[in-house]
Structure formats: C-alpha cells, structure tokens
Curated annotation (Swiss-Prot):
Name of the gene: dinG
Any single Gene Ontology cellular-component annotation: cytosol
SUPFAM superfamilies with a match to the protein in the record: P-loop containing nucleoside triphosphate hydrolases (SSF52540), Ribonuclease H-like (SSF53098)
InterPro entries, A to Z: ATP-dep_Helicase_C, DinG, DnaQ, Exonuclease_RNaseT/DNA_pol3, Helic_SF1/SF2_ATP-bd_DinG/Rad3, P-loop_NTPase, RNaseH-like_sf, RNaseH_sf
Subunit and interaction comment: Monomer in solution.
Domain named Helicase ATP-binding: residues: 241-496
UniProt comment concerning the protein's domains: Changes in the ATP-binding site of the helicase domain can affect the activity of the nuclease domain.
Protein's UniProt name: 3'-5' exonuclease DinG
Activity regulation information from UniProt: The nuclease activity is inhibited by ATP or ADP.
Length: 897
C-alpha cells in the first residue's frame, strides 16, 4: 500500500443542511501502513442552537461547547494535518462537503487529491454484512463502539474497519485483486489507486491450495463432509443429562419426555402431532432426539423451521453449543432449493456483462470476494436488496448454464448422506420438487412451529402478476437497439455480417417493433385492470397496507392477456433455428414473460379464486393481480405429508378446542396421527395475570377514538406505577399509529422510548426494545409470535383487539373455498392460535412475572368466548376498571420485590 497517510474524518453537525448548519465536533484518525499513527479531536463552538434530536443522537449539549474553539480558531491546524492525506469518511460526501465549506468560510481552499468512501470499501470487503451502518459494522466485526455518533469514536471505528478491509484485500488471490482493480475504475471515488498499489506490491506466489479456478474466477474449494463418527453407547436420558449439565440449563423431566417421544416416533416411522408449551425449550429436545436417532440408525433427519432467525439460531448457536457440551462433531447443514445456490457460470456471465451501472459494478466486486469465502454458495448470504436484487434475479432467470459449470447445489447433494441434521424452512420444504432431489434423500422430518405451515402453503399456491415486475423484466430487454438485451442482439447481428457468422440473419427492426408493441400491450393490460379497480368495490387491508378488489369480471383482462401472449409467441418465432448463447438469453427472458402471462390466463379461464391489489389507488404502477392455482390442503398433503416416512409436527399452539382436529383437517388425506401434549414449560400460572378492563367501550370501527384513548390511559397507568416496559399488540396499523401519535404528545412518556413496527426493521427494533429499560413497543401481527420479550421488572403485554383476520383480508378470500364454514374451521382457530402466541410473549423463564391486558370485550361477551377462555385456564383472571388495574399492578410489583 505504500506509505500514503489516510485522514479518516468524522463530523458531528447541527443538521444536514450545508448552507445553514455548523460543525460541532470533529474527529480524525490517521492511518499509515495499516496502523493508526495519530488522532485529532475537538469540540467546535457554534452560535446556532443544537436541535433536541441532535443532542439526543450525539449526547452533545450546548454547555459542552462553551469552552470549545470556533472552527476558524482551529482551521489552520486541521488543514495542516490533513492537506497531504487521502481524505476518508463513511458516506464521504457529507463530511467532505461540510469541511470544505467550513474551510472556505476561513478563506482556505481545501481540495484533497484523493477521496475514499468507506461505505464503498465496506460494501465490497464485507459482502455478507446485513447493514453498513457504522455501529452495526463495528458489532459484526468485533470492534467496540461505546458512543456512536461521537466524532472521535466514529472516526477511530471507521479507521479500524478500513484497516480490516485493506488487510482482507491484501490476502486475496492476485487474479481476484486484479479484477477488483479493473472494476474499481468505475467507482465514484479513488479506490482504484489503492487496488493498484496492492497489485503492484503483491508478493507473487502459487495459488493457495484452499482455492480453485473456474474461467477467470478464483473460488474457495469446497471441502466434503467426513462421514460422521459419533461414538456413543448411552441412552437418550444420559445424553440429555450431560447436555443440560454442560450447558448450564435446568433439568426438566418433561423436556426429556418430549425428546424421548420424538425419538420414539422417528424410530417407528410414525406421523405425530405434538403440542409442547411455549417457552419449553423444544428445540433442544428435538435436536437431541434427531442426533440420537442418527447415532442408533445412521439415518439423517430434516428439521423445518418457521423463520430464518430460528434457522440461524439452530446452526450458529444451538448445534455448536451441543457440539461443545457433548464433545461431538455434528454434521448439520442448511438445505434449500437449487435456485438458492450460486453457480460459477452465472458469476462469470455477470462479470462479463457490460452494464454500466454503479450498483451492478459493486455487485460484481462483492461476488469476486464472496466466492473466495463462502463454503455453501447460498445466495441469501449476500443480503441483496433493491436494484442489485432485481438485476441478480433477472440474471438467474435468463442464465443458460455454461459447459462444465460448477453449481454449489451439487455439493449439497454430494454430501447429503453424511449430513446428520438438515435444517430448512417451511417455504423451502413446501416448494421443493423433483429437481430438488436433496429432499428425497430424507425420510424423516420434524416440523417446528408447524401451525405456520398453511401460510407458507398459501404463498406457494398463489400466482402473482405485478406491474412493477413485468415493467422491470421488459426493461431488461429494452425498447431499442441501444438498450440491454436488444443491444446485445444488435451487436450479434453486426458481428454476423462483419465476421460472416454461421447463423441466420436477425430482423433487428422487426424485433424492435415487436418489443415496442409488447410494451404497449402490457400498458393496455394494466390500464384495463386499473379501470376495473376504479369501477369496483375496494376494501382496505390495513395490516398489509393494500386496497383489494375481490369481485370483478375477467373478460377484458383475458382479452388483453391473449393479445400479449400472441405477440410474445410471434416475437419468439424471429429466433427460430438460431442457437447462439446471446439469442438463448433473450429467448429465455421472453419465455419467462410468456409463462407469467400464460399461467395467469389459464387460471382465470379456469375460474380460480383471484383478486386485484393496489397499494396506491392513484398509481397504476402499484397494481398486482393474484390467482390461487391449487388448494392449500392439496399442497400440504403432497409436499409435506406424503414426502416423509416419519413426520412430526410440533408447536406450542397446535390444539384448538382441546383437540388437534383443526390442524388435521389441513390435509385432505385420512392419515392416522399419534397426538401428544407435553407441558415442558417453566411457566407458573401464579406469575401471570390476565386483566380484562370493564371501563373500555366496545370497539366501533367508525369511531375508534374513544377506544384508542382508553388503551393510552392504561399504558399511562402501567408505566406510571411500574416504570417498566410494555408490548402493545394491534391488528391494524391505523390504530397502532393513532396510539403512537398520542403517546408522543404526552409528557408522561418523555423519558420513554416509543418504538413501532417498521418494514424490514423488526429484528433491530426488538434489539432496541430489549436493551432499553423504559420502552413501549407497538406492533402488529408479526409480534404476536417469535419474539423474546426481555425485561428486569414486571412484563406487560396489552392486546388491543383479538387477532381475527378481517373478512376483507386476502387470506380469508383465498381460503374460503376450502372450508364448509370458513369462520368456524379456519378464521376462529387461526385467531385463537395467534392469541395463544401473544400470551406466550410474556413468561419465558421461572423468574418472569407479568400481566396481560386484553381490551377486546369479545373475549368474555361473544358466542365464541369459550374457545378463548380455554387458553386462559392456567392464568389468574381479573376483570375491573383502571383503578383496580393499578391495584393489581402494585400487588404484582410487591411480589416481584
């Protein structure tokens, strides 16, 4: 890297408006030769007020700046320190523009010769990181950042991460480094100089044996699993005893019974349903049972989970902990569908693509580094989003496999027999088909959180036609010979003429005209759907924030679909007899579009259940058309029930009305199930109270203000008495945001953090909620389950309404045809299950004490109240007004002490 000096700068300011706001703190960390050699830090005085938000974010208050210098008093000193350095910052435009403006106000012209953005560096160096926010990068890479948004600490942290990135680059194979150098020329900043120096100073040596080469790609060699050699002659009971002892867990006879029950069902190839109480530690039980089954029979077990979070917990936490506790080496692997794994031929094609797009260029560099690291080739490791994901998905769709391609899915297949425990999720379990032969290698399966299977099956059987997706897919082809795939075809035709290639002539002008007509026909199709929406009854789905049309005539839609399919067929005829790879890519894209339209057309003609969804009633671009192709019961029967010899469904909430019948009826085949109820929980009924307010008016949809005000009053009463955190669960965003707005305006909550559910941010919000002592979390259906509520004081879960799906919910509409009485057989069991899951958020260990507040009087006044009351049999129940609620809180608080 030479002896260049990097000035890693971080600024805190009064805001982000360059012409108005001021710098209030500057931190600089100087780096040379991958070593921190110096630091500089100063508070900066300003005559502007520091907004409360900035004070809260930075912990910098106005009195801290009283003795600090103004920028013009330290400008010369700072300039002298950084003038000959490479200027570095995280999101560099912000810091660079602010400091240049500050220098300019002091009559100093600052123009760094080279500029580096660490956001760019970190995206390339750490391609699998979930976030590139500085605090989350620091946590992911083991760097302590005690005070985020303080300039000195942020600058030092950025510098340490930059050093890690540079060291990682320097260890890469030379061919990879050279490709990064060439690609870096297309970046926004001066990273190419850094890569050039690394290439120039590279100590040439043979390629390390841990790597192999495919075309121009250096990739990490895949190491096959060794056949398991678990030497154990004891019983499951002794295995369980050793595990809980070494892991520091409580010995629970019922947990052992659960493990023994699962093992017995596996050994006898049975099909079983097991309800194991929430907070039971069931994952340890089924992991030990699966391991013991493998030890005794040599057969491996598939475990399907509900979420990626639980998948990760099993693979990265629970199984490694078992390995250490038992001194075993358990071969466990995440198993997905073939399309979830990378092929090196696809990466090669992406690298050769001449798309001049910044995000695509970053993606190419990420792929080059990722493929030197990944043992699995699991595409989801890359956490692709936005334009990168759309580009990548399109490349997968149009990829024509290269000769001698290296596909990582084949590694999974090759090692399947040596895997003791396979981990998958419900979506992959249901989606797997004949091509995914890895699933056929497992005869035994444990399905955790089995009550969620129908939701994933419904997603699987529902086909979608989206304006945004079709528009994007058409855009990848282009409208003229200067765009995307049409450009490649145009270049091929020119090459055919110049080089006399042995392929038939391509009618470029005809192709261009056809594509323009396809674009127009697509616009016509969605304009027709848009007109139908405007002429129909529209129902709001508040949970998903969409507007739905359930009843509509399909004649005009079918007419437009027929026209666009016909045009696609005629366009495909242009390429008859041409087998060139460029033509194959375009044909594949056109066939993808044709199949999309054709599947929807066939389903609509057959009269399958369908509905139209639109996010914004004034924007055609937000339209989606959904069609249900198959019955959920058929898919669950074929893809799950008939696939395995032994099959164990396990959940904390499988029963409804003291019976497993509601879950059994999700399969349209009369199969005998062994059923078990195992109470392994540490939960004690005396620790938990259910309070039902008597002074809250019944919910009225047209006027919910009074209902919302009552909820807020109870939150005030709870926080005033306990000073503890509270989880409030809603069935609509509208009510959630009404409560949020009221809480934010009340002085009682000035020292509370009010958090609300946000799209794709739930994991982060849960972390924040669990870290704060005084916090209120407002959430919808997502938080009714799969959420570990941590608190030192009293715990409180408030349920605004019973979690019934609205009759205008798309799920209700799609499932209606599968039941004689949809409400009794599907909606009511679903609501009771979700309610039970909500109750399960409260007590997670023997020391927890808490209270559940249910505001919905249907819990005690409806004709179906008995089904909910059954779920509360183990809880102490009390009905009363807000004064009695306060009295109960004080009693619980006294016991807690």
């Amino acid at each position: 890297m030479g002896m260049a000096t990097y000035a890693v700068v971080d600024l805190e300011t009064t805001g982000n408006q360059l012409d108005f706001d001021d710098i209030i703190q500057i931190g600089i960390t100087f780096v040379r030769n991958n070593q921190i050699i110096d630091t500089y830090h100063s508070m900066i005085r300003t005559n502007l007020e520091i907004p409360p938000f900035i004070q809260a974010l930075t912990s910098i208050e106005e009195n801290m700046l009283q003795q600090a210098p103004y920028f013009n008093q330290v400008a010369e000193e700072i300039y002298d320190k950084i003038k000959d350095c490479i200027f570095v910052a995280h999101n560099v435009d912000f810091d660079l523009n602010f400091i240049k403006k500050a220098f300019k106000d002091c009559n100093i012209q600052y123009r760094p010769k080279k500029v580096i953005d660490t956001l760019e560096i970190f995206k390339i160096a750490f391609p699998t990181d979930k976030s590139y926010q500085l605090s989350e990068l620091a946590e992911a890479h083991g760097i302590t950042l005690a005070n985020a948004h303080r300039a000195d600490e942020d600058a030092a942290t950025t510098a340490k991460l930059m050093i890690l990135a540079f060291e990682k680059f320097e260890k890469l194979p030379l061919d990879t480094l050279k490709q990064l150098y060439y690609l870096s020329k297309q970046l926004k900043y001066d990273l190419y100089d850094i890569f050039f120096e690394m290439v120039r100073q590279y100590d040439a040596k043979p390629l390390d044996k841990s790597y192999e080469k495919f075309e121009q790609i250096i990739y990490r060699k895949q190491v096959d699993f060794k056949k398991p050699t678990t030497n154990y002659n004891g019983s499951l009971k002794s295995l369980y005893s050793k595990a809980v002892d070494q892991l520091g867990l409580t010995y629970r006879p019922q947990q052992l019974y659960l493990a023994e029950t699962i093992l017995d069902q596996l050994m006898h190839s049975e099909k079983a349903m097991i309800e194991a109480s929430l907070g039971s530690g069931k994952s340890l039980a089924y992991l030990l049972a699966a391991l013991m089954y493998n030890i005794e029979t040599g057969k491996h077990v598939m475990i399907s989970t509900n979420t990626k979070l639980l998948q990760s917990q099993l693979l990265e936490k629970d199984i490694p902990a078992m390995n250490e506790a038992l001194n075993f080496k358990i071969n466990a692997l995440l198993i997905k569908s073939k399309s979830d794994y990378i092929s090196l031929g696809l990466i090669s094609q992406i690298l050769k693509d001449d798309t001049s797009n910044y995000e695509v260029n970053i993606l190419k560099m990420q792929l080059l580094i990722w493929i030197t690291e990944t043992p699995s080739g699991d595409i989801q490791e890359l956490n692709l989003k936005g334009g990168q994901k759309m580009y990548f998905d399109q490349k997968i769709e149009t990829y024509v496999p290269a000769r001698h391609d290296v596909h990582y899915y084949n590694f999974i297949k090759r090692n399947a027999q040596n895997i003791q425990i396979g981990i998958t999720n419900h979506a992959h379990l249901i989606h797997s088909d004949v091509e995914n032969s890895i699933y056929q290698l497992f005869d035994d399966c444990i399905v955790d959180e089995a009550h969620r299977l129908p939701d994933y099956a419904l997603n699987q059987v529902t086909n979608e036609l989206s304006y945004a997706d079709i528009k994007y897919q058409l855009g990848l082809i282009g409208k003229n010979e200067n765009e995307k795939l049409l450009k490649a075809i145009d270049q091929l035709e020119k090459q055919r003429i110049l080089e006399k290639l042995d392929i038939a002539p391509i009618d470029i002008f005809g192709l261009k005209a056809s594509m323009n007509e396809i674009h127009e026909l697509n616009e016509q199709l969605f304009s027709t759907i848009f007109t139908i929406i405007n002429d129909s009854d529209v129902y709001d789905d508040d949970i998903h924030r969409f507007h739905n049309v359930f009843t509509f005539e399909t004649k005009d839609i079918l007419k437009d679909l027929h026209a666009i399919i016909d045009k696609l067929n005629k366009t495909l005829e242009i390429f008859n007899g041409i087998s060139h790879k460029t033509v194959k890519s375009l044909r594949k894209q056109l066939l993808y579009l044709k199949d999309k339209f054709k599947n929807i057309e066939q389903s609509l003609k057959a009269g399958h259940t369908s509905f139209i969804s639109i996010k914004n009633l004034s924007q055609k671009s937000t339209i989606r058309l959904y069609v249900k192709d198959y019955a959920v019961k058929d898919v669950l029967t074929k893809q799950v029930l008939e696939k395995f010899k032994s099959l164990i469904f396990i959940s904390g909430t499988l029963k409804f009305n003291h019976s497993f019948d509601a879950f059994k009826q999700l399969f349209n085949k009369d199969v005998h199930f062994n059923t078990f109820e195992v109470n392994t929980s540490l939960q004690s009924a005396k620790n938990t109270s259910v309070f039902i307010p008597s002074d809250v008016a019944s919910y009225q949809y047209k006027n919910i203000d009074e209902y919302v005000a009552s909820i807020v009053s109870y939150i005030i009463e709870y926080t005033t008495i306990t000073s503890s955190k509270c989880l409030v669960l809603f069935t609509s965003y509208k009510m959630m945001h009404m409560v949020q707005d009221m809480l934010n305006e009340l002085p009682e909550f000035e020292d509370y953090v009010v958090l609300t559910q946000q799209q794709n941010q739930n994991y982060k919000i849960v972390q924040q909620f669990n870290n704060f002592d005084k916090a209120i979390l407002l959430g919808t259906s997502t938080f009714f389950e799969g959420f570990d509520f941590q608190a030192n004081g009293i715990k409180c879960v408030m349920i605004a309404k019973l979690p019934f799906m609205n009759k205008h919910n798309a799920k209700y509409w799609l499932m209606d045809s599968e039941f004689t009485s949809t409400f009794k057989e599907y909606v009511l069991p679903d609501a009771v299950t979700r309610f039970r899951q909500g109750l399960g958020r409260l007590i997670r260990n023997e020391n927890d004490r808490g209270i559940i507040v249910s505001f919905d009087d249907r819990l005690i006044n409806s004709n179906y109240k008995n089904f909910f009351e059954q779920t509360l049999e183990n809880y102490r129940q009390k009905k009363g007004d807000i004064q009695q609620f306060g009295k109960l809180l004080r009693q619980i608080q006294k016991k807690k002490k």
